[in-house]
Design a protein with these regions (language model features):
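Structural alpha-beta junctions
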Residues: 24-32, 91-100, 123
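Beta-rich catalytic cores
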Residues: 45
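Conserved catalytic cores of phosphodiester-cleaving nucleases, focusing on short active-site segments
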Residues: 18, 22, 49-72
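Acidic carboxylate-rich catalytic motifs and surrounding loops in phosphoryl-/glycosyl-chemistry enzymes
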Residues: 34-40, 102-110
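Mg2+/Mn2+-dependent nuclease catalytic core
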Residues: 66-89
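Non-catalytic C-terminal interaction segments of nucleic acid-processing enzymes
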Residues: 2, 6, 24, 52-55, ...
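Acidic-basic catalytic patches of nuclease active cores, encompassing PD-(D/E)XK
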Residues: 1-41
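Acidic, metal/cofactor-coordinating or nucleic-acid-engaging core segments within structured domains
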Residues: 84-104, 113-119
Length: 160
């Protein structure tokens, strides 16, 4: 699996930093009884984790790290996410009756952005483009043509 390589482990390190930041912001600063629960990184789970508040599931999420600054992401205008992942999160949102969230760690600025992608019924909360594009296949390189979603920058927020 790609996560077991040197690049995969570095990406996992960044993701753990991001999730710790989310934990401290959501739980400590806002005084909520929320927890971030990760899925097994050695498996290809349909989502990267769940948010649990007061013992109840309150969200599912996709999390990614990108070697970008906030300004670079703003210039791109959107966050590219594999469309299959968006649809998997949407289906889980529908089935579990919780929102689907996206967390993006911008490595260069150490900034966490987030998007509330669906409501608790699995309805998309904003429009986004879907296109077939050639992208990097894995953290370790290669290329592949996939159907990708482009989540608009303006629909995301910086986690403060």
């Amino acid at each position: 699996m790609d996560i077991l390589t040197e690049r995969g482990q570095k990406s996992l390190e960044y993701e753990r930093k991001m999730l710790e930041r989310i934990r401290s912001t959501m739980c400590d600063k806002h005084k909520t009884n929320s927890q971030i629960v990760e899925t097994d990184k050695n498996m290809d789970a349909k989502v990267d984790g769940m948010v649990v508040t007061n013992g109840e599931l309150s969200g599912v999420f996709e999390s990614k790290c990108r070697d970008l600054s906030l300004m670079e992401l703003r210039r791109y205008g959107s966050w590219l996410v594999t469309f299959d992942k968006i649809m998997d999160g949407k289906r889980l949102s529908e089935m579990l009756r919780v929102p689907y969230l996206g967390f993006l760690y911008l490595i260069k600025d150490k900034v966490v952005m987030y998007w509330k992608i669906t409501d608790k019924h699995g309805n998309f909360l904003f429009d986004f483009d879907v296109r077939n594009t050639r992208t990097q296949k894995t953290i370790n390189g290669g290329s592949v043509v996939r159907t990708n979603a482009y989540l608009p920058f303006k629909e995301g927020s910086e986690l403060l």
